Amino acid sequence: MSTQFRKSNHNSHSSKKLNPALKSKIDTLTELFPDWTSDDLIDIVQEYDDLETIIDKITSGAVTRWDEVKKPAKKEKYEKKEQQHSYVPQQHLPNPEDDITYKSSNNSNSFTSTKHNSSNNYTQARNKKKVQTPRAHTTGKHVNLDKGKHVPSKPVSNTTSWAAAVSVDTKHDVPQDSNDNNNEELEAQGQQAQENQEKEQEEQQQQEGHNNKEEHKQIEQPSLSSKKTTSKTSAPQPKKMSWAAIATPKPKAVKKTESPLENVAELKKEISDIKKDDQKSEASEEKVNEQETSAQEQEEETAEPSEENEDRVPEVDGEEVQEEAEEKEQVKEEEQTAEELEQEQDNVAAPEEEVTVVEEKVEISAVISEPPEDQANTVPQPQQQQQQQQQQPQQPQQQQQQPQQQQQPQQPQQQLQQQQQQQQQPVQAQAQAQEEQLSQNYYTQQQQQQFAQQQHQFQQQYLSQQQQYAQQQQQHPQPQSQQPQSQQSPQSQKQGNNVAAQQYYMYQNQFPGYSYPGMFDSQGYAYGQQYQQLAQNNAQTSGNANQYNFQQGYGQAGANTAAANLTSAAAAAAASPATAHAQPQQQQPYGGSFMPYYAHFYQQSFPYGQPQYGVAGQYPYQLPKNNYNYYQTQNGQEQQSPNQGVAQHSEDSQQKQSQQQQQQQPQGQPQPEVQMQNGQSVNPQQQMQFQQYYQFQQQQQQAAAAAAAAAQQGVPYGYNGYDYNSKNSRGFY
């Protein structure tokens, strides 16, 4: 009795102080958990504010009703009274006493009917939340605890709010838990089925009796095991539909990988078969038997053509060999790329097609129906380009070791081929190539900038590496013909170093800020010559200006082109945009001045310094904005932001050029000299070093320049608008 008394006492004094918010929560909770009274819920609602947490606690069993366990025997007195009313659902309202009587009742009819009805309407909805029995019942007689999934103890109240709550639950929960592709159909079906069920159950409740028990167990177990949480009638349907949706693509995806990609005719047959099957399967989605047969047919059909394919492989390879023979007549080098590309095409195109098969069946025809030869030209364009780049550094080596008479007839052919390839490349490939080329061919570009007429023709020369090599082949005979034969060996050696350096730094571009510890210790990166390299290269770009040692002021940044026009006045209009564009390639990330080791160590080679301009953790490695160099170079214009680009950089480097040319030119170098057109002497060893240095430096600079351009134009990339010296930010780290 003590518990009874406590309960009623608690009831009376708590109902007075209920505020409306608590009351609404308790109402919703009693609808969700019909066997919990408001008395049971009051404490929980007062303890936890949030409805969701309360529901979680109750469903997970973390919270249990305090009085439930203690008096099982008392409640049995009430069962016989309640059983008389149990069949009339309209009068049957949620009531804790009823609930307990049902648990312990021995009358199988009343028990099964309530169990049947409640489990359909309610526990199916609860199962969506994957609920275990909410609390530990110790009454010995309730049957269903061992199922673990649904709670038997709920009485049926078919009041409208209750049914509405259930249907709302199913509406929200079905799409989350059901794994089918047909969520929307299922929602509609689930709702209809539930409404129908509730009506039927109200009518048929009294008639159904024991049969219900068996049916219910049979139906519920599969739906529980598959976690299909829709109601009974709709539970098998999603299973069938999802089974069809899952089963039909599988044979396609598996068979596709087996069949070789070259056999276009066979693939077309397969595609037509698959389309037919898709139409069948769409027509017969509800009819499972037809689905199964079509899936089997499909497996057989896809199995047959793949076998035929494997038989037909040798024939098709024969055809491809003929096509390749035709290609050999046109261009010799394309033979290699074509073969490599076909191999790569198998690797590249196979996974793509596999994916398209699974996702959208119809698109396969678009992908496959192109003949593989076209794909060899169109699909992996960037790969073709990379192969070209790897071949071409080797070609100049061979050509320059040959006598010059052989060299010149080969050039027109090679340039033809390169122009063809340039036409093939899509814009993406060019964009990708741009990074690699810029770094690879700096030296040749310097030479090209002397030939202003050619600049006019190829203003976009640094977009296509192939053309640069072609032009280099054209230009080299001119200086070479003025030289003794002994000059060829250092130049071919220089080309070899070009290739080696390119491969050495090849991956620098992909991880712009990354470098490995020994990077600057290598022979290829000569610190002693860096000033000379800078000087020489910029001397070439800026024409004769620095030969006469006049300093170019800030306003004269454009005078690079003016100086170049002393030698070739004709091309002034063409040259000025081209050189202006060419300038940022040479710009140095650390503000024009060239500190050999430390600047590299911090600004360049560590992952912190480079590409992120000013993310908070990296301040120590960046020089502050306002006077960028810590030490002032000759002109006080260093205050610009680091990559302000063309003007500032060309200035600084030209000052250094002018100083170093004063040192170099009086000393007149004894080695054989390449006479550039502007008459400036360049020693081949220096050329080698320019090249290696610039290839590396440019890859670093492109990343830096991109980041800096984004940062300086106010793109929000990191913190970069931060003023390190202002009073506000003084105590920042």
Curated annotation (Swiss-Prot):
PROSITE patterns associated with the record: CUE (PS51140)
Annotated stretches, region: Contains the proteolytic activation cleavage site: 495-525
Record PTM Phosphoserine, positions in chain: S259, S272, S306, S641
General function of this protein: Recruits the ubiquitination machinery to RNA polymerase II for polyubiquitination, removal and degradation, when the transcription-coupled repair (TCR) factor RAD26 fails to efficiently displace stalled RNA polymerase II. Also involved in telomere length regulation. Binds DNA.
Protein name in the entry: RNA polymerase II degradation factor 1
GO CC annotation: chromosome, telomeric region; cytoplasm; nucleus
Segments of skewed composition (Low complexity): 103-121, 222-240, 380-446, 465-495, 655-677
Gene behind this protein: DEF1
The protein's assembly and partners: Homodimer; may form higher order oligomers. Interacts with the large RNA polymerase II subunit RPO21; the interaction is direct and serves to bridge RPO21 to the Elongin complex in a manner dependent on transcription stress. Interacts with RAD26.
PTM info: Ubiquitinated.
First-listed, main subcellular location of the protein, grouped into a coarse class: cytoplasm
Record GO terms (molecular function): DNA binding; ubiquitin binding
Ranges where the record places region Disordered: 69-446, 465-498, 635-682
InterPro entries attached to this UniProt entry: CUE, DEF1_CUE
Acidic residues: compositionally biased ranges: 297-327, 336-357
Record family assignment: Belongs to the DEF1 family.
Modified-residue entries (Phosphothreonine), positions: T337
Domain CUE: 21-63
